[in-house]
Swiss-Prot record:
It comes from Shewanella woodyi (strain ATCC 51908 / MS32). The lineage of its organism: Bacteria, Pseudomonadati, Pseudomonadota, Gammaproteobacteria, Alteromonadales. Belongs to the HSP33 family. One of its GO terms (cellular component) is cytoplasm. CDD domains: Hsp33. Its main location: cytoplasm. This is 33 kDa chaperonin. It holds the Pfam family HSP33. Disulfide bonds join C225-C227, C258-C261. Under oxidizing conditions two disulfide bonds are formed involving the reactive cysteines. Under reducing conditions zinc is bound to the reactive cysteines and the protein is inactive.
Length: 286
């Protein structure tokens, strides 16, 4: 079965739309950079699926960041991406994590920040407290505050696969609560195994076989890291030459690693001289 796709669909006889995302390869690439424990693997999987759903829902051209921060064992979990469904993510934690801990146990007192940076127009940022036991619940609260449209979100992850569904009332006139609640009840019956193992068409048929559903062409979701040797060189340029020379004297080279993909960039004294003379550092060392 083809994985790593986002599927959009509409109900022909109700002013409600939906999305379904199934992830495997992109999820594994996010996890491969670090030896995450199971609770973090599941958290990042759900967050990856959620960011894909949000990217399609919020309809923008540019970059998106969904970041969870807290004072608990997990201090940070973030997925960054763009409207092309190119995503990357990382988490930071300390100590032992409870295998059955909910979102509040993982993050303690925390919040979620959703940032949209369009290629044109103003940057938008929304913040919601992590005061629900699940990520899906916090995202539903975000939509209640920002979009003010009834929205239902379902998220699953197991360390190998991640998946999610989003249901939302279309912004049209009239009261659509009854039809939304009916479809929400049907959607709530979906099982993780169905989303992990079945094609999207089969999942939708099982859930909504008495409804008329229009399914659009899938959009591929990929892992894509934006790190590069040039970006690392630019970061070095922001540090004082004196400090950089001090590190070189002590360590012989400057090592810079990407948290997202674990790629390491190495710069020696010749590279550093080129950086500070505003010429491109040689491409031979990485």
């Amino acid at each position: 079965m083809s994985k790593d796709n986002l599927h959009r669909y509409l109900f022909e006889n109700a002013d409600v739309r939906g999305e379904l995302v199934q992830l495997e390869q992109s999820y594994q690439e996010v996890l491969s950079a670090h030896n995450y424990p199971a609770p973090i693997q599941n958290l990042l999987g759900q967050l990856l699926a959620a960011t894909s759903l949000l990217t399609a829902t919020l309809k923008f051209n540019g970059d998106i960041s969904v970041q969870l921060q807290g004072d608990g064992p997990v201090s940070l979990a973030v997925i960054n991406g763009n409207n092309l469904q190119q995503l990357r993510g990382v988490a930071r934690f300390k100590g032992e994590l409870s295998s059955d801990g909910d979102l509040q146990q993982l993050f303690g007192k925390g919040h979620m920040v959703i940032t949209l940076t369009p290629t044109e127009g103003e940057r938008y940022q929304g913040v919601v407290a992590l005061d629900k036991p699940t990520l899906a619940g916090c995202l539903e609260e975000y939509f209640a505050q920002s979009e003010q449209l009834p929205t239902s979100i379902t998220l699953f992850a197991n360390g190998k696969q991640a998946a999610g569904m989003l249901l939302q009332v279309l912004p049209t006139e009239g009261d659509h609560n009854a039809e939304f609640e009916h479809l929400e009840q049907l959607t709530a019956t979906v099982k993780a195994e169905e989303l992990f193992e079945l094609e999207a068409e089969e999942v939708l048929h099982r859930l909504y076989h008495q409804e008329e559903v229009r399914l659009f062409e899938p959009v591929a979701v990929t892992f894509s890291c934006t790190c590069s040797r040039e970006r690392s060189a630019s970061a070095i340029r922001t540090v004082s030459r004196e400090e950089i020379e001090s590190i070189l004297a002590e360590q012989g080279k400057i090592e810079m690693g990407c948290e997202y993909c674990n790629t390491n960039y190495s710069f020696d004294s010749i590279d550093v001289a080129a950086i500070f003379s505003n010429t491109q550092a040689p491409e031979t060392k990485q």
